[in-house]
Regions:
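Glycine-rich beta-alpha junction loops
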Residues: 41-42, 185-187, 209-210
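Active-site/binding-pocket entry motifs
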Residues: 44, 53, 62, 200, ...
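Short clusters of hydrophobic/aromatic residues that line enzyme substrate/ligand-binding pockets
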Residues: 46-47, 56, 61-63, 147, ...
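Conserved nucleotide-cofactor-binding alpha/beta core module
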Residues: 83-202
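Substrate-binding/catalytic lobe of Class I Rossmann-like enzymes that use SAM or dcSAM, i.e.
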Residues: 191-221
Length: 221
């Protein structure tokens, strides 16, 4: 992948990305570091070329295998809520296209990302490699189990909704750490922030949302 591919042109140009950043500001995204990344990380390389003309719309798009790339507002909101610091270790449950992965990896020291659909893993790795992001480990696995051998984590982000928060993810959250996750069924979900302190866990409910379900187990495709 060439530098020109990363920079984009026309509907993937920097001007188009800047317009997206402006819309994110209008919708309440205030973290300047997150906004800068939303304007600089090339979303168009994380989707099929047939959809590249829509890469900087605030909409979700298909990435194959019944999965989608999240809309930019959701990516920015989740990243802002996680409040990642440069020296922290983060777990992402659901690599998908790798777009949210790239944003998080640009914010933290080490990122560990799990994807249940095996066919998506090499695609994400190729795209992340093109961006020369070297602080990421991606593997095929069950997100419900987390990645205990690399925990505890300062931040855990789950861009899919389990009916209840998996116990393993709570156990892998470090003291001082934060978990951001939508919780609920297809009919009703709430976006939650879980913080672990020396005294235990605190839960903050933010708003009603609608995410794809977090599916247990693994799959080839």
């Amino acid at each position: 992948m060439s530098q020109c591919d990363l920079q984009g042109s026309g509907m993937t140009s920097q001007r188009t990305r800047d317009r997206l950043v402006g819309r994110l500001r209008e919708h309440g995204i205030e973290d300047e570091v997150v906004l800068q990344l939303m304007g600089s990380v090339p979303r168009h390389i994380f989707i099929d070329e047939a959809w590249s003309h829509r890469a900087y719309e605030d909409s979700y798009l298909p990435i194959g295998h019944g999965q989608t790339i999240s809309q930019p507002l959701i990516v920015a909101l989740m990243s802002q809520l996680l409040n990642v610091q440069p020296r922290e270790r983060v777990l992402e449950v659901g690599t998908g296209s790798g777009y949210q992965t790239a944003i998080l990896a640009s914010l933290c020291q080490r990122l560990f990302s799990i994807e249940r659909i095996e066919a998506l893993v090499p695609r994400a790795q190729e795209r992340l490699g093109a961006m020369k992001l070297r602080n990421i480990r991606v593997r095929h696995g069950d997100g419900y189990a987390g990645w205990p051998e690399h925990g505890p984590f300062d931040g855990i982000l789950v861009p899919a909704a389990p009916p209840e928060i998996p116990t393993a993810l709570i156990e892998q959250l470090a003291v001082g750490g934060r978990l951001v996750v939508p919780v609920g069924t297809d009919q009703a979900q709430l976006l939650k922030v879980i913080d672990r302190t020396d005294d235990g866990l605190t839960e903050t409910i933010l708003e009603a949302v609608h995410f794809v379900p977090l599916v247990n187990g693994t799959a080839k495709q």
